[in-house]
Every structure is written in C-alpha cells, then in structure tokens.
Amino acid sequence: MIFENYKLKNITLRNRIVMAPMTRNQSPGGIPTQEVIAYYSRRAKAEVGLIITEGIEVSHEASSAYPNVPRLDSIEAKEAWKKVVEGIKNNNGAVIAQLWHCGGFRKLGMQPNPEVPGHTASGLVKPGKKVAHEMTLDDIKETIDAYASDAKICEEIGFDGVEIHGAHGYLIDNFFWSGTNIREDEYGGSIENRSQFVSDLSLIHI
C-alpha cells in the first residue's frame, strides 16, 4: 500500500512516502541556492511522493531567528523557489511549503531586522521570563496578513499546498501554552481562546 498512488484532495501522489521538513540553513539572504534546488530535485527523483519544504520564514519583521533560512519576500527568493518546485514536479513529485514564524526565539540584533525583538503572545518565552515583545491586536493582524500574503505567493509559485509550523515553542505554539500566554483578551485564557490565533490563520483566504 505504501507504494501505491494516493489521492490527497486535489493532489495525486505516486506513493505515500512523505519527506518531513528539515531546516538546512543554506539560503543566504533568504534565497535558496542552486544546491538547495538540486537537493529537493534529488529527493523527488528518488521517488519521494510528497516533499514538505524546510521552514520558510514568514514575511513579517519578527519572524526570523536563525541564519540562512529561506524566505519569500524578494524577487530572487521567489524565482529560486519556482526552480525548486519545477525540479520536484519535473521528477513527478509533489511539494508543500512550510511557513514558519520563530516568535520568541528571535533576539535583538538578528537579521534581517536587527532592531526588532522577538514577538510572543504575552512577551514570555517561558513562564516568568519576559524578554520578547507582547503582541498587540494590530501585531496579530499584521502577522496573519503576512501568512496570507505568503500563502498566496506559494500558490502563484506552484506549490501544491502550505503547512504551518505550529510546534517547538515557536509563535503559534507560544499562543497555545498557558504558561506563555497570559493574555486577557480573545487570544488568551481558555484553551479555546489560546487556539484563536491558529484558528484565524486556518481561515485565511488567498
């Protein structure tokens, strides 16, 4: 069964083998290199049915926390991702982009916006440790808009879908945890409210 074709909504996969997202830190300036393009093509050529890309930083000023992670907010980056997608599809693979906001893992001084601190639900990176910027409602809207914009770009580039990174203490996960989300508005309190941010993300239309 694992090697049989599989219908995933509007995508037909040649098998049920999926490559998980793995950060590679090989995209200086946020632009995937020729080596990155070749890397993904090789995986498709080896008959991986579905490839989920490494985390792509959302086009938001506070999304980054690590060097040489790819982005979508430049012409050069978009063109490079088009080549990644073409390489995968030319080898009969399918590909989903993973969008990633690092939240409180970001520190002042990090590129590409060294003056911008990390953003979290309540300014906390762990219970009692407030070292980040507490997101306002405007910040939350801007972040959701950034996800929506990047999802649209992914569609235009030719990705088969988008996955949103929601684990490991990054921004979305930070909203889920009662120890790091002590907000008193519609995005904090009950688990339903702490899930409101990701719920809003899931409802974006592109």
Locations of regions flagged by a protein language model:
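N-terminal capping/small domains of soluble enzymes
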Residues: 1-102, 143
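Short coil-to-beta-strand
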Residues: 14-17, 48-57, 117-122, 161-175
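Alpha-helical packing segments of well-folded alpha/beta enzyme cores
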Residues: 39, 80-84, 139, 143-151, ...
